[in-house]
């Protein structure tokens, strides 16, 4: 499959949670699909559904592929890295392909004018179809009504992409956010009661830009603890599950239906350079019914 000028995955903007719906034919295994593409921070960003025995030719440039569901056969990659580990998603072959399985993937291509350092949120404004639905706001603007931890902090979030199947069931929500130097995006464990506006999910993060190369995910015993295990992440890397898993490698649930996580968070890195250097991250909040097993 060659990349089209215009995508053929239908989109809509009527989701009560905001953002863009992408309506994928995940059960129609005979037909591959591709979304429109968006630009953000000099990165070309696009989603693809690959039917079995499909081949996707990648654009010219430096390419990174995040597998959301299924498997890419030629690069031996599925959705999840081993638990609490970090791996690169860079793809050096000119193509990716499926075997007997399908694959739902996100593709990031660094363009020639992609800045090495992202130091202004204006650089990250989305360009592309219905990009007004992907507006950035600060964490404080979004969460300040019930949380004061982000007041004065240089961190931002945009509405993202809801990847839906034929029945409009959400397979994954892709949530873009940005973290400035030294910012702690709060210690949390996703234990709140799930609801239609905040469903349960199995989460992994994909790094689109690493400001200082020292920021990353951390584990800790409780909020406020000084003891943390940090997992630094750089451009194009993703991490494996932080959530608890059963003997089959599937998510463990709390009594309220939320996926069970230990305390964790994202810590923005630090360096001696002047000015800001943002970490740019996409959180993949995957429907537990669609996440693969990971022992």
Question: Where are the regions that the model predicts?
Answer:
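Hydrophobic beta-strand residues in large extracellular and virion-surface proteins
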Residues: 56, 65-70, 105-106, 174
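A short, N-terminal "cap"/entry segment at the start of jelly-roll beta-barrel domains
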Residues: 1-52, 90-93, 99-176
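Conserved short histidine dyad/triad with adjacent acidic residue
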Residues: 41-59, 175-200, 217-223, 240-247, ...
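Short, conserved, surface-exposed binding loops centered on an aromatic residue
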Residues: 163-168, 196-198, 266-267, 273
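Short, conserved beta-strand element in jelly-roll/cupin
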Residues: 62-74, 198-220
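A short hydrophobic beta-strand segment most commonly corresponding to one strand
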Residues: 100-123, 129, 205, 240, ...
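Flexible, charged surface loops at secondary-structure boundaries
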Residues: 57-61, 98-101
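Short acidic-glycine-tyrosine-enriched beta hairpin
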Residues: 47-50, 69-99, 219-269
């Amino acid at each position: 499959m060659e990349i089209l000028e215009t995508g053929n995955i239908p989109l809509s903007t009527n989701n009560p949670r905001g953002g863009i719906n992408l309506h994928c034919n995940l059960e129609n295994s005979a037909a591959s699909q591709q979304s429109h593409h968006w630009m953000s921070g000099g990165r070309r960003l696009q989603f693809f559904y690959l039917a079995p025995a499909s081949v996707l030719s990648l654009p010219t440039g430096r390419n990174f592929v995040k597998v959301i569901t299924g498997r890419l056969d030629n690069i031996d990659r599925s959705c999840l890295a081993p638990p609490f580990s970090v791996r690169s998603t860079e793809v050096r072959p000119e193509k990716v392909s499926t075997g007997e399985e399908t694959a739902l993937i996100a593709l990031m291509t660094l363009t020639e004018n992609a800045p090495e350092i992202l130091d202004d949120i204006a650089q990250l404004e989305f360009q592309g179809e219905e990009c007004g639905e992907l507006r950035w706001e600060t964490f404080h603007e979004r969460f300040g009504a019930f949380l004061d931890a982000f007041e004065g902090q240089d961190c931002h979030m945009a509405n993202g992409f809801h990847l839906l199947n034929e029945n409009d069931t959400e397979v994954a929500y892709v949530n873009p956010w940005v973290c400035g130097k030294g910012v702690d995006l709060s210690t949390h464990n996703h234990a709140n009661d799930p609801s239609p506006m905040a469903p349960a999910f199995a989460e992994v993060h994909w790094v689109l830009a690493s400001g200082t190369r020292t920021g990353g995910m951390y584990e800790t015993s409780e909020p406020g603890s000084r003891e943390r295990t940090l997992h630094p992440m750089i451009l194009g890397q993703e991490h494996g599950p932080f959530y608890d898993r059963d003997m089959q490698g599937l998510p463990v649930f709390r009594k309220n239906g939320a996926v069970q996580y230990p305390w964790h968070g994202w810590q923005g890195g630090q360096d001696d350079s002047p000015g800001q250097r943002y970490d740019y991250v996409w959180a993949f909040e995957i429907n537990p019914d669609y996440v693969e097993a990971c022992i």
